[in-house]
């Protein structure tokens, strides 16, 4: 919408504007073509995504009321549960692992494996369920992944998993809930 309005102003304007950028001349039309790139670099895409009806946006106070203290700290403060403490480590039944915050299905139990790390690990998520970002909390870059619907932090991706992906989605158990096969998945939280 913004780009269309800006283009319309350009089309109706009889003034030709040039912009100086690091010693080069950029005509207005060239500048307008680059607006989407600039806006996405400034985080505009996050604003648009937050308005998507599929997204679940709640403030931290709301999440604190809905979740256990540990789940809140992991999901929305990017904490990590202590290794070996999740009962989901031993979960081997067929079923689906859903986000503990919004109930979005994230992993099929068929993609879970024993990684020996002390956290539930998967080699493949359900399509479109996760988003990623880079974090530097341990100084070196790691790929963090989160629920694409509510943004809740789930864990990190490592390149030491089994075939066919070679990936290990190392998940905080407190960020997941397990739904056994044959039981209805919970409704998505609103």
Regions found by a protein language model. Give the residues of each.
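Mid-length scaffold segments of soluble, non-membrane domains
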Residues: 92-121
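N-terminal targeting pre-sequences for secretion and organelle import
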Residues: 164-190
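Residues immediately within or flanking Cys/His clusters that coordinate Zn2+
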Residues: 96, 144, 167
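Cys/His-coordinated zinc-binding microdomains
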Residues: 103, 151, 174
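C-terminal segment of N-terminal export signals and the immediately downstream linker at the start
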Residues: 45-77, 81-82, 186, 190
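Short cysteine-rich clusters marking metal-coordination/redox-active sites
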Residues: 99, 147-150
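N-terminal secretory signal peptides and thylakoid transit peptides that target proteins
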Residues: 17-39
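Short, non-ligating residues that shape and space the ligands of small metal-coordination modules
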Residues: 108-109, 156-157, 179
């Amino acid at each position: 919408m913004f780009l269309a309005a800006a283009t319309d102003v350009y089309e109706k304007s009889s003034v030709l504007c040039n912009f100086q950028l690091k010693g080069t001349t950029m005509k207005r039309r060239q500048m307008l073509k680059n607006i989407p790139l600039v806006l996405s670099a400034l985080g505009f895409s996050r604003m648009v995504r937050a308005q998507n009806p599929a997204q679940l946006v709640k403030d931290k106070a709301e999440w604190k009321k809905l979740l256990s203290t540990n789940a809140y700290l992991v999901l929305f403060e990017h904490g990590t549960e202590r290794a070996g403490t999740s009962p989901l480590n031993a979960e081997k039944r067929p079923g689906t692992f859903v986000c503990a915050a919004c109930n979005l299905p994230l992993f099929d139990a068929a993609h879970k494996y024993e990684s020996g790390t002390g956290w539930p690990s998967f080699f493949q998520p359900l399509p479109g369920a996760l988003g990623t970002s880079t974090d530097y909390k341990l100084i070196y870059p790691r790929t963090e992944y989160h629920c694409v619907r509510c943004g809740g932090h789930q864990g990190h991706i490592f390149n030491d998993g089994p075939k066919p992906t070679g990936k290990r989605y190392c998940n905080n158990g407190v960020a997941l809930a397990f739904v056994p096969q044959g039981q209805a998945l919970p409704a998505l939280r609103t």
